[in-house]
């Protein structure tokens, strides 16, 4: 019993660190420089720009139905940890919007913002994955599809799902500009 409780404490501490790093990458580098990553985070950034609520709020709202579906189709422990991580990402992202300045890449350093933002998000995701958690969103869909089609690599599934989101982000962006 003690070992299990200790493991959960370590897992939660690492999930806190993972969510903080991920959120800072989104807030500090990605969102202010109009870089829309794939998945729920990318959709959330676009919604925040259009409707004005915090990016973290949209991350939570879009993840609620996915988490519910995940509870029916995936490992319960993974989904509990994912739910905790999504709430942490929501809180940290919205707090960062209030208190943390952003990296302005308007001087031509958009590539730097994309690299550092992507790296921070990747480190956060990796830390979470290492503890049987996800950031929610398309990660949940990837795990569900991967379970139904074990012959497909999870990275491939994730790339396809994020590619679909990115293509829709571009289409919506073009329609909004015209």
Each predicted region: which residue ranges?
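Structural signature of hydrophobic alpha-helical transmembrane segments
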Residues: 47-61, 110-115
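Short amphipathic alpha-helical coupling elements at transmembrane boundaries
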Residues: 42-49, 139-150
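Mid-bilayer segments of alpha-helical transmembrane spans in multi-pass integral membrane proteins
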Residues: 87-95, 99, 110-132, 153-155
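Hydrophobic, membrane-inserted alpha-helices
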Residues: 44, 62-69, 160-169
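C-terminal ends of transmembrane helices
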Residues: 14, 18-19, 65-77, 143
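Membrane-interface helix termini and inter-helical loops of multi-pass transporters
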Residues: 34-44, 97-107, 139
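Conserved small/polar residues in nucleotide/adenosyl-binding loops
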Residues: 170-176
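Membrane interface segments of multi-pass transport proteins and intramembrane proteases
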Residues: 2-4, 51-56, 94-108, 146-155
């Amino acid at each position: 019993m003690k070992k299990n409780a200790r493991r959960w404490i370590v897992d939660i501490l690492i999930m806190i660190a993972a969510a903080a790093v991920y959120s800072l990458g989104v807030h500090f580098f990605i969102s202010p420089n109009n870089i829309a990553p794939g998945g729920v985070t990318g959709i959330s950034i676009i919604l925040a720009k259009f409707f004005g609520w915090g990016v973290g709020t949209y991350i939570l709202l879009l993840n609620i139905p996915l988490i519910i579906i995940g509870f029916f189709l995936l490992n319960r422990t993974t989904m509990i940890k994912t739910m905790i991580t999504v709430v942490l990402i929501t809180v940290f992202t919205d707090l960062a919007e209030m208190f943390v300045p952003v990296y302005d890449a308007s001087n031509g350093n958009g590539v730097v913002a994309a690299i550092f933002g992507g790296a921070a998000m990747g480190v956060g995701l990796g830390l979470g994955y290492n503890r049987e958690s996800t950031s929610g969103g398309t990660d949940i869909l990837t795990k569900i599809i991967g379970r139904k089609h074990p012959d497909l690599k999870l990275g491939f599934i994730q790339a396809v799902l994020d590619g679909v989101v990115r293509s829709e982000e571009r289409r919506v962006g073009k329609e909004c500009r015209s």
